[in-house]
Amino acid sequence: MNDQTLPPDYLEFAEELADAAAKVTLTYFRLPLEVENKEAERFDPVTLADKGAERAMRDLIAQRFPSHGVLGEEEENIAGEEPWTWVLDPVDGTRSFISGIPLWGTLIALNDGTRPALGVMDQPFTRERFIGDGSTASLNGRPIQTRACRNLADATLMVTSPEHFQQPPYSDLFSKLSSEVRLVRYSGDCYAYCMLALGLVDIVLDPGLKPYDIQALMPIIQGAGGVVTRWDGGDAQNGGDVIACGDPRLHAQILELMQSS
């Protein structure tokens, strides 16, 4: 299908979803909290904040737009009767959340059947709300843009965790990039991508993302002038190994490096 025009009330509704999630997450943040592990082979935490925030958003979607689909991290996917699908990550950065560190956020995307047409990253503790539609991006209503950075030597690189880059070929790539950039920082999750859109970070690199990890961030970064793709240069909306760059020239340079390594 072709891209659809985004109805104006959809942005307002996306912000209502963010408000509903915030009421849940702020109830639990920096308080004693039971943590479950979703996987046997590694620590993949989930809390009542994750589950409750997603449930609150799903309830609102079911009431207001029952024909829309829902793709979320904590519950089963719902196929819609229309092309529109809400893509939800109630707490992106749960490890930071349970550690009391405000490098987490609620991710809300609206996919029109072709692409994420709207993205919201809400950090209710710091009262920051990033919004993008692929053409424009804002922080709390103020327009934002990425910064120019053509060369690796001038770049700030962020990755969620160094443990993701311990084995080849990931280790080889990370060794190459980290040795050439000016600065490397860790543990940003969705917050790192928004700092890229704000013009404070130049590269964010993550392997093995899910659609709900990246779809909300794509319209924000693209609206601020940046680029988000898979490591092979393909569409990142379905997740996988993802790279985001604030400067398209730097993105092209890194893709070439990846393909040659």
Regions found by a protein language model. Give the residues of each.
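Short strand-turn-strand beta-turns centered on an Asx-Gly dipeptide
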Residues: 113, 140-142
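DPxDG-like acidic metal-binding loop motif
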Residues: 80-135, 155
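Generic detector of well-ordered alpha-helical packing
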Residues: 51, 55, 74, 90-93, ...
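Small-residue (primarily alanine) positions within well-ordered alpha-helices
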Residues: 14, 18-21, 119, 217, ...
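Residue-level signal for inorganic ion chemistry
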Residues: 25, 50, 61, 94, ...
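An extended, acidic
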Residues: 145-261
